[in-house]
Amino acid sequence: MPPKLYHPQPTHAIPVSNMRVNTRYEPTAGFSGTSVPSVQAANPSAYLPNSATAQMGFQLGKNAVNAGQEYVEQNFGKWLSTTRLHHYFTVTNSYVVAKLLLIIFPWRRRSWARKLRRSEINGSAEGYCPPAEDLNSPDMYIPLMAFTTHILLLCALAGLQDDFQPELFGLRASKACAVVLVEFLATRLGCYLLNISSQSQVLDLLAFSGYKFVGLILTSLSKLFEMPWVTRFVFLYMYLATAFFLLRSLKYAVLPESTMAINATITSHQRSRRIYFLFFIAASQILFMYVLS
């Protein structure tokens, strides 16, 4: 029979302070055993000198932003609204190809009248069809892409001639924007003096002023042949094609004959003046294209 074991008993009293138990739970980070200090959420208002003053400042800033948005919407919303811009960028691949061929070979086109979008309820005209549904409708996609391609192509040709500089991008782009702006303002002034007004006229004029870059791209590409007579021939042909294209395309705006025109009824004297103005727009393309080439 094994002997009985006796455990030693403490012979002195244990202080109460050493028997204190920490009842607060502190989470550990992973398996390292280190405690993660508790972080209290910061109060943003504690850092502000006066919360009432800050709220007043925020409210004034919000009111100023809302007033600015309302002013822009009232004065420029009718030209630069999202709905109108979406109309000019509603294109398809087949439309882009057909439109480029129309700009280069406008002589083959027979009908230049724009299609009207009819209401499904009473059949009344609600506006013009988007470019994807009407080849004669102006768009913003081709002018913007042609503008960008024209700038890049000129810089690339300068690089082939060891004459490229980084500043050339800005110079070419600024020059092209200035020419387009001058043409747009001159055309807009002529429309104002002749009392020519139609819906979405501003965006239409901007779109038509950018189609000339298609001919300028072909003119720049012809320089790769290093034969001056080829470049002159391409430039002259593209000028005639662009002028004829604008002459037929702008007719619906300058000489309104549809129900979408605001002032469709004009006298014979006004009509003759508008025809001269239309030919002036077409003839002036040779000057703008020469400056940009």
From Swiss-Prot:
Protein task: Required for fusion of ER-derived vesicles with the Golgi during ER-to-Golgi protein transport. May be involved in proper membrane localization of Rab GTPases.
Origin organism lineage: Eukaryota, Fungi, Dikarya, Ascomycota, Taphrinomycotina
Superkingdom to which the source organism belongs: Eukaryota
UniProt family annotation: Belongs to the YIF1 family.
GO BP terms, alphabetized: endoplasmic reticulum to Golgi vesicle-mediated transport; intracellular protein transport
Keywords from the UniProt entry: Cytoplasmic vesicle, Endoplasmic reticulum, ER-Golgi transport, Golgi apparatus, Membrane, Protein transport, Transmembrane, Transmembrane helix, Transport
Membrane-crossing segments per the record: 140-160, 176-196, 202-222, 227-247, 272-292
Membrane-side (Lumenal) residue stretches: 161-175, 223-226, 293
UniProt keyword annotation of Endoplasmic reticulum present: yes
Organism: Schizosaccharomyces pombe (strain 972 / ATCC 24843) (Fission yeast)
Gene behind the chain: hrf1
S-S bonds: none
InterPro entries in the cross-refs: Yif1_fam (IPR005578)
Name used for this protein in its record: Protein transport protein yif1
Subunit structure: Component of the yip1-yif1 complex, composed of at least yif1, yip1 and yos1. The complex interacts with the ER to Golgi SNAREs bos1 and sec22.
Topology of this chain in the membrane: Multi-pass membrane protein
UniProt keyword annotation of Cytoplasm present: no
